[in-house]
From Swiss-Prot:
CC terms in the record's Gene Ontology section: blood microparticle; haptoglobin-hemoglobin complex; hemoglobin complex
Organism expressing this protein natively: Aquarana catesbeiana (American bullfrog)
Family: Belongs to the globin family.
Entry function: This is a tadpole (larval) beta chain.
Tissue: Red blood cells.
Positions with a binding annotation for heme b: 64, 93
UniProt GO BP: hydrogen peroxide catabolic process
MF (Gene Ontology): haptoglobin binding; heme binding; metal ion binding; organic acid binding; oxygen binding; oxygen carrier activity; peroxidase activity
Protein's name in the database: Hemoglobin subunit beta-3
Record key words, sorted: Heme, Iron, Metal-binding, Oxygen transport, Transport
Amino acid sequence: MVHWTAEEKAVINSVWQKVDVEQDGHEALTRLFIVYPWTQRYFSTFGDLSSPAAIAGNPKVHAHGKKILGAIDNAIHNLDDVKGTLHDLSEEHANELHVDPENFRRLGEVLIVVLGAKLGKAFSPQVQHVWEKFIAVLVDALSHSYH
């Protein structure tokens, strides 16, 4: 179990209050597909992902980005049991979707970029440090069901 200080929880929640789950989720998934194009292979049902413009304009990318940040929202509301909160999602990605768990780390990286761009100077090194810890906890929780 991860120990969160009251200050860390406050930092996570303070940043999260500024997040637009729909817009920022779309931005994060769009970035993932553009920066790491091989991650698109898990999304063959999404249709046209042939260019940055096609990815950015794809309604399925938009909807799935929102869904991803919705799961992160759930984890933030359950910081003391992120692994338990994301257990079913981990099982699904490991056993049904067969997603390479390294992609969770990549998604975390692009989310950090999205948050940094959105918050500017407010995303200080100290804030980033807390968010890097949170992303590591997310990645660990989502990777838990892999053998």
